[in-house]
UniProtKB/Swiss-Prot annotation:
Mn(2+) 2 binds at residues 303, 308, 356. This is Phosphopentomutase. It catalyses: 2-deoxy-alpha-D-ribose 1-phosphate = 2-deoxy-D-ribose 5-phosphate; alpha-D-ribose 1-phosphate = D-ribose 5-phosphate. Isomerase that catalyzes the conversion of deoxy-ribose 1-phosphate (dRib-1-P) and ribose 1-phosphate (Rib-1-P) to deoxy-ribose 5-phosphate (dRib-5-P) and ribose 5-phosphate (Rib-5-P), respectively. Binds 2 manganese ions. Coiled coil: none annotated. It comes from Shewanella frigidimarina (strain NCIMB 400). It comes from the Bacteria. InterPro entries: Alkaline_phosphatase_core_sf (IPR017850), DeoB (IPR010045), Metalloenzyme (IPR006124), Phosphopentomutase_DeoB_cap_sf (IPR024052). One of its GO terms (biological process) is 2-deoxyribose 1-phosphate catabolic process. It is found in: Cytoplasm. It holds the Pfam family Metalloenzyme. One of its GO terms (cellular component) is cytosol.
Length: 405
């Protein structure tokens, strides 16, 4: 019975990519810098001491970090008995965004340039926002700038609730984000507004429209909820998910995976919010999974709650929680199963700003007859998709080199 389980630690990079200089990210290292902060006693909020990831270390995380950066992360060493195949991958895609990373790991790199709203203020063309407002029956909007999601709620959340005007904002990624209060504006109204924006953004080649619902009564308690929804464009070619689905297999999405692939190649989707729920649902779906099945989970909190917010201690605590659940995963695996731990980009919580970092990602693979040891540096995330295609004996992808015979 052939089954593949992809646990995608959103933003968990393992050192600056070969082309990091093009992005201003030379020296970034999400894993290494978190480990160093922990070792230095600078990440003791809610946790204490060195970064403890014994199970990921057994899958080869420390060794992957060493091969990527030339040194072991603080607290990790060569004295661990590694049970998995480990490597690290550079990104071929033009951007360091979520869709690019996900699509590339499924065998379809983004080799064109996304559209961006690069102006920090007055970010959106008036022609665009006028069309969105007219179609939605709204008389105005707030924001129109680059901002972090938490910051803009503190600044504009109350005005939004008083006026009913949605908050439009963007970032260094190819995104158009809309924040609205779940009660005063309504979640369905927000989703409908995002669908309108998605249609009007087609000429601008923007990767995603993101609905950012929030709750609360004021800046002190405004909080984004788990009802986020991403409206992505379709990948430019069939991914390995599409190929397995077309071959009669099952592709189970947990978390925001389905949104990122614009629901293409997905046969079942399950919503879950927070690391605990996401891991619980992953285990539940693995127990249910039959032959020719992919279960694919995005653990978004690493990125959204800790990476972008530059919360090093929070990121470390979340990693340690994730690691603590891995024995439960190992206990339910079957001999032919293939498990892959990876990431879609970096988001170094010690780095300047609030954006993603251009980093290599870990490629930790276990099962399916793979020998423990190094997979080396992979030239593209697409090696993951190609390996999955090889594992399921699907038609090869156009990009990537399989590490599975």
């Amino acid at each position: 019975m052939k089954r593949t389980f992809i646990l995608m630690l959103d933003s968990f990079g393992v050192g600056a990519a070969t082309d990091a200089d093009k992005f201003g990210d030379v020296g970034s290292d999400t894993f290494g810098h978190i480990a160093q902060a922990c070792a230095d006693g600078k990440a003791d909020i809610g946790r204490q001491g060195p970064l403890k990831l014994p199970n990921l270390a057994r899958f080869g995380l420390g060794h992957a970090g060493f091969e990527s950066t030339g040194k072991f992360a603080a607290g990790f060493a060569d004295n661990v008995e590694v049970i998995g195949a480990y490597g690290h991958a550079d990104e071929l895609s033009s951007g360091k965004d979520t869709p690019s990373g996900h699509w590339e790991m499924a065998g379809v790199p983004v080799l064109y340039e996304w559209g961006y709203f690069s102006d920090l203020t007055n970010s959106f063309p008036k022609e665009l926002t006028d069309k969105i407002l007219e179609r939605a029956g709204l008389d105005g909007f707030l924001g129109n700038c680059h901002a972090s999601g938490t910051q803009i709620l503190e600044e504009l959340g109350e005005e939004h609730m008083k006026t009913g005007k949605p908050i439009f904002y963007t970032s260094a990624d190819s995104v158009f984000q809309i924040a609205c209060h779940e009660e005063s504006f309504g979640v369905e109204n927000l989703y409908n507004l995002c669908k309108i924006a998605r249609e009007e953004l087609e000429p601008y080649n923007i990767g995603r429209v993101i609905a950012r619902p929030f709750v609360g009564t004021g800046p002190a308690d405004f909080a984004r909820t788990g009802n986020r929804h991403d409206y992505a464009v379709l990948p430019p070619a069939p991914t390995v998910l599409d190929k397995l689905k077309d071959a009669g297999g099952e592709v189970v999405s947990i978390g925001k995976i389905s949104d990122i692939y614009a629901h293409s190649g997905i046969t079942q989707q399950f919503k879950a919010t927070g690391l605990e729920e996401l891991f619980d649902e992953t285990l539940a779906q693995i127990k249910r999974a039959g032959d020719n099945t992919i279960v694919f989970t995005n653990f978004v909190d690493f990125d959204s709650h800790y990476g972008h917010r530059r919360d090093t201690a929070g990121y470390a605590k979340a990693l340690e929680y994730f690691d603590s659940r891995l024995p439960e995963l190992l206990a339910i695996l079957q001999p032919e199963d293939l498990v892959i731990f990876t990431a879609d980009h970096g988001c170094d919580p010690t780095w300047v700003g609030t954006e993603h970092t251009r980093e290599r990602v870990p490629v930790l693979a276990y099962g399916a007859g793979l020998s423990a040891g190094s997979l080396g540096r992979r030239k593209s995330f697409a090696d993951i998709g190609q390996s999955i295609a090889s594992y399921f004996k699907l038609e090869p992808m156009n990009y990537g080199e399989s590490f599975i015979n």
